């Protein structure tokens, strides 16, 4: 549903999947095998029905021509919307950096190890921020709570620390992305209801190939920040942390 065609011709106009008719000068014509059942063999129909039972999401997309709510081969399916940190657990933060095209992000996390739940809240998703901007946002949101950030930016981390943010860089190593993903997949992820940019990333962060541990380098700005802080807590600061 992130495709520009969906955004322009469906979402912006309030057009539902499967609609037929003319809206704002655009003709919508949607047909499926259900409109031609009389001319199909029993075997073809049985194949379609079997897919409907076995994989309803794929059936709705491939057979009925609907738009996917999440990308094919998406990495994370173990998440839902919910209240953030209802039990008052310790909150710490992850941060990733961009500038012009890539967003700067700040993600709050509370981890319930006994219930295997990670509570997640989006605090920042914005491009074009300078060091002072980041410090001000971090100070307002986090106070003196810990931030684990992208260690590829040591100068920026040092500057934010000198200004007063309680911030440190993550550790990196071979296989760190896969390790971080595995940690997140082993927990239930509960996303605060207004964290829409993280939801978009969770719905679109995908494997590069089926059966591989390689990931498409896109839709990952908040998820990188999430990996930094969860790996710090769940892998231990003495072990490899994710990028």
Residue ranges: model-predicted function:
Residues 219-243:
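Charge-patterned, long linear interaction tracts outside catalytic cores
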Residues 37-95:
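ATPase catalytic-site recognition across NTP-hydrolyzing enzymes
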């Amino acid at each position: 549903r992130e495709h520009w065609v969906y955004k322009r011709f469906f979402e912006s106009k309030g057009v539902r999947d499967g609609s037929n008719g003319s809206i704002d000068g655009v003709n919508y014509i949607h047909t499926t095998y259900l409109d031609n059942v009389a001319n199909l063999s029993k075997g073809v129909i049985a194949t379609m029905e079997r897919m409907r039972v076995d994989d309803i999401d794929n059936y709705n997309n491939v057979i009925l021509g609907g738009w996917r709510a999440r990308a094919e081969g998406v990495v994370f399916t173990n998440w839902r919307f919910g209240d953030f940190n209802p039990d008052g657990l310790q909150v710490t933060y992850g941060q990733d950096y961009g500038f012009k095209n890539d967003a700067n992000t700040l993600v709050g996390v509370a981890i319930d190890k006994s219930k295997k739940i990670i509570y997640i809240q989006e605090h920042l998703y914005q491009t074009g921020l300078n060091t002072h901007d980041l410090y001000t946002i971090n100070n307002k949101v986090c106070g003196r709570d810990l931030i684990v950030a992208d260690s590829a930016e040591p100068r920026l981390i040092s500057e934010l620390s000198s200004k007063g943010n309680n911030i440190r860089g993550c550790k990196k190593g071979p296989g760190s992305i896969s390790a971080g993903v595995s940690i997140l997949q082993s927990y239930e992820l509960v996303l605060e209801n207004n964290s829409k940019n993280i939801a978009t990333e969770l719905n679109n962060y995908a494997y590069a190939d089926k059966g591989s541990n390689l990931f498409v380098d896109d839709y990952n700005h908040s998820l990188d920040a999430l990996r930094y802080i969860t790996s710090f807590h769940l892998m231990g600061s003495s072990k490899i942390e994710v990028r």
